[in-house]
């Protein structure tokens, strides 16, 4: 009777007891010690967090590289534009005087600006058939005999 009384007194505390883990039975294959399970869970959580941090770092690094490349392209484009003769910034261009009209001046004869004579006589079709004005020396041809 005394035992029954003690048992009934302890009955309300049974609800606080940890339930038996039927999934992790030491007699079943694949049994894991609970402390190893906790450690494995913690390691998996840590790996997930590290993966997230690495992905964030990769994203940031990619954005920085993209910005750097865009800046380089813009700088190079500006350099090319500034080095070209028809620069788009007229404030930085030096205007040269055009006193004689240049190539657009149509008052002059284009041949008179050369003031040069042709060194070779002018040729026409069939000129090679005509005899030259200076006689050519007669050079006997060497014949090859038997």
Swiss-Prot record:
Sequence ranges of Polar residues compositional bias: 77-118
Compositionally biased spans, kind Low complexity: 32-54
Region called Disordered, residue ranges: 27-54, 70-146
Pfam families: DUF2756
InterPro entries xref list: DUF2756
Extent of the signal sequence: 1-17
Keyword annotations from UniProtKB, A to Z: Signal
NCBIfam families linked to this entry: PRK10350.1 (NF007675)
Name assigned to this protein: Uncharacterized protein YhhA
Originating species: Escherichia coli (strain K12)
């Amino acid at each position: 009777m005394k035992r029954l009384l003690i048992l009934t007194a302890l009955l309300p505390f049974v609800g606080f007891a940890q339930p038996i883990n039927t999934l992790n039975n030491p007699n079943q294959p694949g049994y894991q010690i609970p402390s190893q399970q906790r450690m494995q869970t913690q390691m998996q959580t840590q790996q997930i967090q590290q993966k997230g941090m690495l992905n964030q770092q990769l994203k940031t690094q990619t954005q920085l590289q993209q910005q750097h490349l865009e800046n380089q392209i813009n700088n190079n484009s500006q350099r090319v534009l500034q080095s070209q003769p028809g620069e788009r910034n007229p404030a930085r261009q030096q205007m040269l005087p055009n006193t004689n009209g240049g190539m657009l001046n149509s008052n002059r004869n284009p041949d008179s600006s050369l003031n040069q004579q042709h060194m070779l006589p002018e040729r026409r079709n069939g000129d090679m058939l005509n005899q030259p004005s200076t006689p050519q020396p007669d050079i006997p041809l060497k014949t090859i005999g038997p």
